[in-house]
A protein has these predicted regions:
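Pre-Walker A (Motif I) flank of P-loop NTPase domains
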Residues: 1-4, 98
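Post-Walker A helix-loop "phosphate-sensing" segment adjacent to the P-loop in P-loop NTPases
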Residues: 23-32
Length: 175
């Protein structure tokens, strides 16, 4: 399994990057996870409406910090999902080596931990001129030394060219 921790500020192009890789390799070969997913589920149960204003982003960031300190649920969720993906492929006697997993994580210390514990590489999607940070997780995006940096500083064609280079660097067969 090829595991990549993906980060970038709001609107940097993380989702576009991940979805284009999924489109190129096939839906069954690319999984997109996020440590914030269980936090969003929790937040919805207590009234969050799914919108991501600066106030909402700070709320989600603070809630994630609390839950991580309490019981490490975001990382437990990721590890459980990775086990599920691995077992799914092994059940059908298919090598998980042909699978790419993107995990969205914002906090530098959590990125470092995930890279170490999951044998992952880190990717920063950088886009000049995006909105300013409303919370520490967004503000700390650049406070990590990433393995791969994708400069999303032009048009979609340029981003797609960088995605093609990324695809050439990994050893996963397309559909």
């Amino acid at each position: 399994m090829h595991i990549y921790i993906v980060n970038g500020g709001p609107g940097a192009g993380k989702t576009t990057f991940e979805n284009k890789v999924r489109e190129a390799l096939g839906e069954h070969k690319v999984f997109i996870l996020s440590t914030i997913d269980p936090i969003k589920d929790m937040a919805k149960r207590i009234g969050w409406n799914g919108v991501k204003t600066p106030k909402d982003r700070k709320f989600l960031s603070d809630l994630k910090d609390l839950v991580t300190a309490y019981n490490d649920a975001p990382m437990t969720y990721i590890k459980d999902e990775l086990r599920f993906i691995n077992n799914l492929y092994r059940t059908y006697d298919v090598s998980p080596d042909q699978v790419v997993v993107f995990i969205d994580i914002r906090e530098p210390q959590e990125i470092a931990r995930a890279c170490k514990e999951l044998n992952a590489k880190s990717i920063l999607i950088r886009r000049p001129g995006i909105e300013t940070a409303s919370n520490h997780a967004d503000a700390e995006v650049e406070n990590y030394t990433y393995d791969i940096i994708i400069e999303n500083d032009s048009d979609l064609d340029n981003l797609f060219a960088q995605i093609k280079l990324f695809l050439l660097s990994i050893k996963v067969d397309s559909m």
